[in-house]
Each structure stands twice: as C-alpha cells, then as structure tokens.
C-alpha cells in the first residue's frame, strides 16, 4: 500500500491553520493576513517583499495583494529600498503591535494544546524528520 504521508502532512497543516483561523476570527483577519503578519514579525526587521514571499512560500504577486490590504488596514508600511529602487521594504506599524501579540498568543496556546501528550523528545524527533524531508525535496528540486 502506498504511503499517504504527503497528504497526511498537508491535511495536518490545513486543519492546524483552520483551528488558529477560527480562534482569530474576532480580529477580522483572513488566514493570509495573519500568516503574513506573523511571518513579518518573525523575520529580521524591514524584509523585502521578495524575502517575505520566499519565507511564506507564496508567489510575490499574491503577497503584493495581501500587503496592499494590510497597508490599507494601517498594519504595515512599505518603502523603497535605498540600494535597489525596485525593492520594497516592509515594516509593521504600532497599530499592528496588539494584533501581533494576540496572533502570537493564539498560535502559541494552540500549539501547546495540539502538542499535549507528546513529549519534548517526540516533538524534536518530528521536527528533525520534517527537516530531513524538506532537505530531500530541496535537493530534488535543485537537480531539475
């Protein structure tokens, strides 16, 4: 019987994000919005749109639409990079601070609940295995 590991991992990510999405409904953010805000907050300050798109794993045109919406909400600003006028740097605004705190809190508490009953060693083993899978995939992509 063929392994369904890839499908299982994809489903896990989908339901995990859906649970967080449900818990963040009061903030009136779409999943794309909170994932983007969370990623901006985790990356070094003033990332370029290209770097952010790579970190999130989406295409830059999709990210631009999301950033436009977040800028309209007053949660981010974008400015032209001094070294490359084509590049835009992204910065969270002060208005984003309480939202980021709530998003981080919900993500952290949800992670804790999801991982309840799983030991630290088991989590570390899983993280290591996922890292190996990702490395294998990257190597396969680089061969093409």
From Swiss-Prot:
Top-level lineage group: Bacteria
NCBIfam families assigned to the protein according to its UniProt record, in alphabetical order: PRK03573.1
InterPro entries assigned to the protein according to its UniProt record, in alphabetical order: HTH_MarR-typ (IPR000835), MarR/SlyA-like (IPR039422), Tscrpt_reg_MarR-type_CS (IPR023187), Tscrpt_reg_SlyA (IPR023071), WH-like_DNA-bd_sf (IPR036388), WH_DNA-bd_sf (IPR036390)
SUPFAM superfamilies xref list: Winged helix' DNA-binding domain (SSF46785)
Family assignment from sequence similarity: Belongs to the SlyA family.
Assembly information from the UniProt record: Homodimer.
Gene that this polypeptide is encoded by: slyA
Keyword Transcription: yes
Domain HTH marR-type: 2-135
Gene Ontology BP annotations: response to stress
HAMAP family: HTH_type_SlyA
Keyword Transcription regulation found: yes
An example Gene Ontology molecular-function term: DNA-binding transcription factor activity
Keyword annotations: Activator, DNA-binding, Repressor, Transcription, Transcription regulation
Portion annotated as DNA-binding: 49-72
Role summary: Transcription regulator that can specifically activate or repress expression of target genes.
SMART domains in UniProt: HTH_MARR
Protein name as catalogued: Transcriptional regulator SlyA
